Design a protein with these regions (language model features):
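N-terminal prepro-regions of secreted/extracellular proteins
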Residues: 1-44, 49
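Post-signal peptide N-terminal regions of Sec-secreted extracellular proteins
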Residues: 30-142
Length: 142
């Protein structure tokens, strides 16, 4: 009986750990702002676009590196699909973060001083349907 209880306790502990890993990703210490998500420092917001009432896509720059974060304003705390995207024109290198998050997607960063970029993001409803998406094509070229 004692071995059965030990095995049952181990099974429950393992199941609880696995269940925790199945839930959507969320930063251990969620950033307090889009700039903080990019790492703070010399990053500053150079553009932003509202995703209806579901979130805002922020483009930040520090003199050499572009950083994009999609910040949720609806279903905050609920894991939903959120995307942040940036692509460099010179070689079409793209960086994307597209997962279920509770607060924001990103940061996605790319070095592109003096180069055009595509940047944007999207949010989804809890059902998985796209709530809002927006992308700016070949902009911020200087």
């Amino acid at each position: 009986m004692r071995k059965f209880k030990q095995k049952a306790a181990l099974t429950l502990t393992t199941a609880a750990m696995l269940a925790g890993s199945v839930f959507a990703s969320s930063p251990a210490n969620a950033a307090s702002s889009p700039i903080a998500a990019c790492g703070g420092g010399s990053y500053h917001v150079i553009d932003q676009h509202a995703l209806s009432s579901y979130g805002t896509v922020y483009l930040m720059y520090n003199g050499s590196t572009d950083c994009v974060v999609t910040w949720k304003t609806a279903y905050v705390g609920t894991p939903t699909e959120v995307q942040a995207f940036v692509e460099r024109e010179s070689d079409f290198k793209a960086v994307v973060d597209d997962k279920k998050y509770s607060y924001y997607a990103g940061p996605v960063k790319i070095d592109a001083p003096g180069m055009c970029i595509i940047w944007g993001g999207s949010t989804a409803l809890p059902s998985g349907a796209t709530a809002s998406a927006w992308y700016d094509y070949w902009s911020h070229c200087d």
